[in-house]
């Protein structure tokens, strides 16, 4: 919105700010780019850790990366079957 008003008033954004914004967009894109293998490994690691505390439906577990203009978010949908009363490490 401010950028629109600045343009209407004839003020151009400083080249420093334009370069900074472009770099930010490149970094966000890089962070969101993840190989299917790495995403699968992340999913397996989440299952290992969470399974120490609760019984989960591994088949219905969903892990995704979402990005908007400013950030990348890890979204995990993990159906819980039941909580474990005692902590136990499998393996």
UniProtKB/Swiss-Prot annotation:
Biological processes per GO annotation: cell division; regulation of division septum assembly
Keywords: Cell cycle, Cell division
InterPro entries hit by this protein: MinE, MinE_sf
Pfam family, one: MinE
This protein's record includes keyword Amino-acid biosynthesis: no
Biological role stated in the UniProt entry: Prevents the cell division inhibition by proteins MinC and MinD at internal division sites while permitting inhibition at polar sites. This ensures cell division at the proper site by restricting the formation of a division septum at the midpoint of the long axis of the cell.
Family label: Belongs to the MinE family.
Protein name stated in the entry: Cell division topological specificity factor
Organism: Desulfitobacterium hafniense (strain Y51)
């Amino acid at each position: 919105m401010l950028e629109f008003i600045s343009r209407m008033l004839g003020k151009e954004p400083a080249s420093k700010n334009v370069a900074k914004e472009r770099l930010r967009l490149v970094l966000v894109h890089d962070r969101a780019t993840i190989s299917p293998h790495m995403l699968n490994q992340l999913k397996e690691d989440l299952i290992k850790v969470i399974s120490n505390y609760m019984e989960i439906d591994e088949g219905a577990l969903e892990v995704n990366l979402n990005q908007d203009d400013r950030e990348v978010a890890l979204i995990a949908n993990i159906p819980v079957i039941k909580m474990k009363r005692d902590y136990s490490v499998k393996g």
